Each structure stands twice: as structure tokens, then as C-alpha cells.
Amino acid sequence: MNDSPAARWTALILIALMMFFGYMFVDVMSPLQALIEQQRGWSPDVFGTYASAEYILNVCGFLILAGIILDKMGVRFTGILSASMMFIGASIKYIGITDWFQTTAFCEWLGTWWVSMPGSAKMAALGFMIFGCGCEMAGTTVSKAIAKWFKGKEMAMAMGVEMAIARVGVFCVFSISPILASKLGGVQGPVGFCTVLLLIGLINFLVFSVMDKKFDGQLVEAGVKSEEP
């Protein structure tokens, strides 16, 4: 199946767009720091703690665990898991910054401990931490998927294209996020928009998984490899 340029580049675009949406979500609140501080009462220290939450578990060894999962379970399982974690984490973060959540008893309870960190920030940090685990796992998975689909083909070029598409997400969100916040009247609009994009990214990877399953079937028939889980 990867002998077809259309098939392998379609596969690349599907997974690259997932990473594009992921990188958009990473920085969606970066240009909105002043707004979130104004609307939710976060201090610069609170914003810094929230932003660092993305990397906490990865620094503590989660990336190594992600590599083990990828080796044991394969590209499809790990990719769907990572895309799901990104979407779930993003949804939790979105809930944490909504106007509705600020009025809940749970948010009030979150504010009763570590009082310098508002309940909304704790909820957003939890979601961002889960998202970060999924995003870094996805990056490793995408690299392995490209190596598989472009073996003996334009592998280096494909990796460069994927990284370029993903990084454009950062440029886009720094431009789009303030506009959405202005149009929608708050920080939750841009975050909600990027959360929906992550759902589309998950769907993209599900489509890729169907293609990858078919590709594996062809490799098994050709005796090149045993079937991947």
C-alpha cells in the first residue's frame, strides 16, 4: 500500500494534522495570559504553574512508558490512546476555565487547598497534564508510523513535512487565539475551538488506523512481517 504515493502521503497528512491540532492546543492560552489573569484571577505564578503541568509526568518518566507501550502494542493502539488522551485532557482543561465551572461546588472545594492556586487553575492544569502525556506520546508514535510507511521511500522528507505542518500550528494559534477571544468574549472560546480540533485529530488517526490495518494485512500476505496488534 505504501508503494502508492497518494496512499502514503494521505497517511502522512492525516497524522500530521493530528499533531498540527495538538501544537495549536499547547499554546492556545499563551497569548491570552493577561485575559485569563483578569477573568479568572490567576497570578503570573499560577499561570506558570499551569503551563508547566504539561511536562510534569513526561519529565517523571512517562515518555519512557509511552515508548514501551508503543513497542508492545503497536502504532494503531498507541496512536488512538494518545489522541484520546489529548482530547480528554483538553476537555477537562476547557471545563476548568468555563464560566459554568466557576459556580460549581467542586470548583469551590478545589479552592480550599493550595489556596494560592484557584480551583479553575487546578482543573486546567490537570487537563493540561493529561493532554501533555498524550501529545508527547503521539509525537513518538507519529515518528514510528512515518518510518513504517516511508521505509525505502522519502522518509526524511516525510518527517520534515510532518514537523513543519505541526509547527505551523503554533504560528496559527498565536494569530487566531486573540481574535477568537475577542469575538467570543473570553478565553474559553479559543480553548473550546482547539478542543474540537483535537476531536477531529482523533478521527483523523482512526482513519489512518484503518489504512494502517490494511497495509499490515498486505505485509503479512507478502510474508514481510507478522501481524501487528
Pin down the residues of each PLM region.
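C-terminal ends and interior cores of transmembrane alpha-helices
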Residues: S84-M117
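Symmetry-related core transmembrane helices of the 12-TM Major Facilitator Superfamily/SLC fold
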Residues: Q188-F208
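Extracytoplasmic
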Residues: T10-P44
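Flexible cytoplasmic inter-helical loops of multi-pass small-molecule transporters
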Residues: S209-P229
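Glycine-rich segments within core transmembrane alpha-helices of 12-TM secondary carriers
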Residues: A156-A181
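Cytoplasmic helix-loop-helix junction between adjacent transmembrane helices
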Residues: A121, G127-I165
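Central cavity-lining transmembrane alpha-helices of secondary-active solute carriers
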Residues: S52-I68
